[in-house]
Swiss-Prot record:
Keywords: Hydrolase, Serine esterase. Pfam families: Esterase (PF00756). GO terms for cellular component: cytosol. This is S-formylglutathione hydrolase FrmB. It is an enzyme of class 3 (hydrolase). It comes from Escherichia coli O139:H28 (strain E24377A / ETEC). The active site is at S145, D221, H254. Its EC number is 3.1.2.12. It comes from the Bacteria.
Length: 277
């Protein structure tokens, strides 16, 4: 992994690395925050998945998470949201193609050549982190919007791999809303059964489980009713007896002003779980 940015932050280092991804067949950037204690010991890892239009920079520059990661001794890994490059398929819209990988494995041309973000996040990236950084095997996952969707899907499908999961403003029923429907049709085809593998509410209804889900949702979020539908997740978790910590916040929108307001509580939540034995 090639170090391309290095910034001192709260006694640790906010770095950005570039590497070639075998899963995605392109060069990828990834942000890695190494707290002060990483200089002397192995630490657990929180993976952060960003939302539509984002890259590895949004979370590391806008959330203020470094203060809390340093306090709680957690490495934070923030990858890009899709494969990148002139040779990678793209679309002339913000919600499909580069910047909109949806954390799935595409099966349809031309997307299936590079869009294997599920494999990248689940397998390739953790292997690289273990190889190059002072990381323990204990990891958690979180994300925002499309990234919140990805975090929920990865945790629900691999409950033994992630200690805990949380999300900000996640797309909880992508097969039922425009963002998910158009992306799934392009990436996965018209067979809607395939869509359900990447739909958190559907996965829970099929019996997939995690110990607990933490979600924060702003009530002044322009996408709340049409695209996100957090109450769908709350309802299915109640029906399936999955413990939740779902909080609704008056006045907060879909932006990083919202994420930065509560990221400290999410990192504390994950730290508590990651440090349990």
């Amino acid at each position: 992994m090639e170090l391309i940015e290095k910034h001192a932050s709260f006694g640790g280092w906010q770095n950005v690395y570039r590497h070639y991804s075998q899963s995605l067949k392109c060069e990828m950037n990834v942000g890695v925050y190494l707290p002060p204690k990483a200089a002397n010991e192995k630490l657990p890892v929180l993976y952060w998945l960003s939302g539509l239009t984002c890259n590895e920079q949004n979370f590391i520059t806008k959330s203020g998470m470094q203060r809390y990661a340093a306090e709680h001794n957690i490495i934070v890994v923030a990858p890009d949201t899709s494969p990148r490059g002139s040779h990678v398929a793209d679309a002339d819209r913000y919600d499909l193609g580069q910047g909109a990988g949806f954390y799935l494995n595409a099966t349809q041309a031309p997307w299936n050549e590079h869009y294997k973000m599920y494999d990248y996040i689940r397998n390739e990236l953790p292997d690289l982190v273990m190889q190059h950084f002072p990381a323990t095997t204990r990891k958690s996952i979180s994300g925002h919007s499309m990234g919140g969707l990805g975090a929920l899907v990865l945790a629900l499908r691999n409950p033994d791999e992630y200690v805990s999961v949380s999300a900000f403003s996640p797309i909880v029923s992508p097969s039922q809303v425009p963002w998910g429907q158009q992306a799934f049709a392009a990436y996965l085809g018209e067979n809607k059964d395939a869509w359900l593998d990447y739909d958190p509410v559907s996965l829970i209804s099929q019996g997939q489980r995690v110990a607990e889900i933490m979600v924060d949702q702003g009530l002044s979020d322009d996408f709340y009713a049409e695209q996100l539908r957090t109450p769908n997740l709350e309802k299915i978790c109640q029906e399936m007896n999955i413990k939740t910590l779902i909080r609704y916040h008056e006045g907060y929108d879909h932006s990083y002003y919202f994420v930065s307001s509560f990221i400290g509580e999410h990192i504390a939540y994950h730290a508590n779980k990651l440090n349990m034995r």
